[in-house]
Amino acid sequence: LVYDAVNKILNKNNILAPKLYTQRYDKNFIEIEDLGNETVFKILKKKGKNKLSYFNQIIKLLIQIQSIRNRKVKNFRNQNYTIPKYDKKILINEANLFCDWYVKNNLSKLRKKKFRKNFKKIIKKLTLKLKLKDNIFVHRDFHVSNLMSVKNQIGLIDSQDALIGNKAYDLASLIDDVRLKTVSYTHLTL
């Protein structure tokens, strides 16, 4: 269970993430720690909250995540797990999501097929030229709905897609979060 292994790495680095309490994986059952339902997103939507303090905590958490060096852990089956590297294959798969989600609903069937073929060719060509500098722990879903407020601390959920990747990935996820108008908050730190 990747989720548990990644959370163990986070916990070992003093980052609050749900712990696995019990599991019967063969019966499709796991019991994990409940971090509650107070997402940072809910807090930031409320009027009168000190939003700057939350953004400061989020940035400190991001720095802490990016400082993780030990990327190996034993999973609940006592097997070694190492966080994989973000590679060109993963990049191509993520680029293809554009076709799966956006193009699928916005082009005719004939245009979709032609677009998909051309898009894949262009993406493959671009990735051949790309030199990935992947050396940082990347959560890959680092946005305010996956950040939990727990007793004056920020916890992290939904970590199963973590990889070793580019340091800009999680920051871009946070800044470009469609649920939150971060532009209206950027003046707070300037």
Specify the residue positions occupied by each region the protein language model found:
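A generic short alpha-helical patch detector that favors 3-5-residue windows
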Residues: 32, 90, 115, 163-166
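Active-site catalytic-loop/activation-segment of kinase and kinase-like phosphoryl-transfer enzymes
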Residues: 81-125
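Conserved small/polar residues in nucleotide/adenosyl-binding loops
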Residues: 186-190
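Well-ordered alpha-helical scaffold segments within catalytic/enzyme domains
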Residues: 102-104, 174-177
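Charged, solvent-exposed alpha-helical segments that act as regulatory interaction surfaces
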Residues: 71-75, 104, 108, 184
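Glycine-rich, phosphate-binding/catalytic loops in enzymes
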Residues: 48-49, 172-174
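Active-site acidic catalytic loop and adjacent metal/ATP-binding pocket
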Residues: 65-66, 123-171, 178-181
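ATP-binding pocket architecture of kinase catalytic cores
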Residues: 1-88, 92, 131
